[in-house]
Amino acid sequence: MSSILKQRVRYAPYLQKLRTAEQCVELFKHGQYLGWSGFTGVGAPKVVPDAIADHVEKNNLQGKLGFNLFVGASAGPEEGRWAENDMLLRRSPHQVGKPIAKAINTGKTKFFDKHLSMFPQDLTYGFYTREKENDLLDYTIIEATAITEDGSIVPGPAVGASPEMISVSDKIIIEVNTVTPSFEGLHDIDMPVNPPFRQPYPHTTVDYRTGLTAIPVDPSKVVAIVESQTRDKVPPNTPSDETSRNIANNLLEFFEHEAKLGRLPENLHPLQSGIGNIANAVVEGLADSKFKNLTVWTEVLQDSFLDFFESGSLDFATATSIRLTEAGFDKFYENWDTYSKKLCLRSQVVSNSPEIIRRLGTIAMNTPVEVDIYAHANSTNVMGSRMLNGLGGSADFLRNSKLSVMHTPSARPSKTDKTGVSCIVPFATHVDQTEHDLDIVVTDQGLADLRGLSPKERAREIITKTSHPDYRDQLTDYLDRATFYAEKSKCLHEPHILQDAFKMHLNFQENGTMKLDSWDKKF
């Protein structure tokens, strides 16, 4: 037992349950239902999952030792290793990484995505364990950075669905990460209370705290304490580029316009932002803008938010995860006293709560796969079928925020077309967010304000303002043709030609380009 482990584990009876990761392997059997802590690649267990993968590889148990795995969102590289070893029978609700995406799209792993605000509560309802006799997860493996005097768990850089998983787990294994500094005091934990006893959330500001800083645990459920000395491994963030900066500039001009007209306050409303180079560009733009005293209510914070804090423009941020690179975490730890006063990590049912999002009037900003001319957005399935990562929390925010923004390049790079694949299409091949959820669509070409517009008005606005010039005439032609035929059949509300609606996608699959010679082309 290391001295730092003894210092971190302040509940003495747990020290009698010390095990190595290898000693825990015997506890796991094929077909079990497992919960892991973690969210967006940080705060997940590491040494126990790796020990199980070692066991599978050494004994050629690929496909013979598999599990139903539930994580708040994505975990770290450990779940990718599980996917490579055919150890994931079922996975939910969100994932990131080529190995697991391959397992899902080749049919080896059954995957279902779910709104991240709903997933933890549905887990406590027994919806995902209803095939089991006791409705419980067999094991939850949770990473802690400290354990309090009463046995409660202090998470690390992610809370996610850990409170709910612990509440519905038969047995619990705690990995105490001693290479990561203790995050004690940074969290605000809400334990699940199911209907009809659930009460309204009291949060009225982004810095409101209920007061619980660790996750309560029934000590009798804890079967092992394992020391971990493995840091989170987050790949470098995609830097902003000219396209993403143009998107950010278009959006910031809109914010300035709305503030000038009094539809937004001078410090805006609490901001929600996703991950990626567009999100980075927006954060960078806000840090350099005239907007001050800003606040954030979001799912995940990345490295750019540290610079946002340092700019003096950001007062406080709430999230369920801090997804930082190694350099980002080093910077965070070095300035702990500064950042910890301006930051709160919450359960994902709180960070993504539609009730709180609507009350605070957040501004939601997310990136889709594609948006169609009537403002339906596809966030998950390329060409309607190939799963990327999952829905995540985008719809939690987009349906409930005061302003719901979809930002996307007008076209994405393609190996077979110099313009790329159009992100504005006649008809989305899969719909995650409907036309009723989006207020703004913004690309590097411009911004379409859709508030209060009819479908045909939205279509003209989206095509004219946001589509790539190389696709604009083609999309306009589709809308004109659809309107012509719809007028004949008296169905002009939202005109479509079903036999043409996916021709851009079909042409890309057959010919490597979304550019059509003619809409009369047959497939």
UniProtKB/Swiss-Prot annotation:
Q: Which InterPro entries match?
A: AcetylCoA_hyd_C, AcetylCoA_hyd_C_sf, ActCoA_hydro, ActCoA_hydro_N, NagB/RpiA_transferase-like
UniProt entry tagged with the keyword Membrane: no
Q: What is its EC number?
A: 3.1.2.1
Catalytic site positions:
299 (5-glutamyl coenzyme a thioester intermediate)
Q: Where in the cell is it found?
A: Cytoplasm
The chemistry this enzyme catalyses reads: acetyl-CoA + H2O = acetate + CoA + H(+)
Keywords carried by this UniProt record: Cytoplasm, Hydrolase
Q: Do you know which Pfam families this protein is assigned to?
A: AcetylCoA_hyd_C, AcetylCoA_hydro
UniProt superkingdom: Eukaryota
Q: Which residues bind CoA?
A: 274-278, 389, 393
Entry GO terms, CC? cytosol; mitochondrion
Q: Name one GO molecular function term.
A: acetate CoA-transferase activity
According to its UniProt entry, one GO biological process term is: acetate metabolic process
Function of this protein? Presumably involved in regulating the intracellular acetyl-CoA pool for fatty acid and cholesterol synthesis and fatty acid oxidation.
Recorded family membership: Belongs to the acetyl-CoA hydrolase/transferase family.
Q: What is this protein called?
A: Acetyl-CoA hydrolase
This chain is encoded by the gene named: ACH1
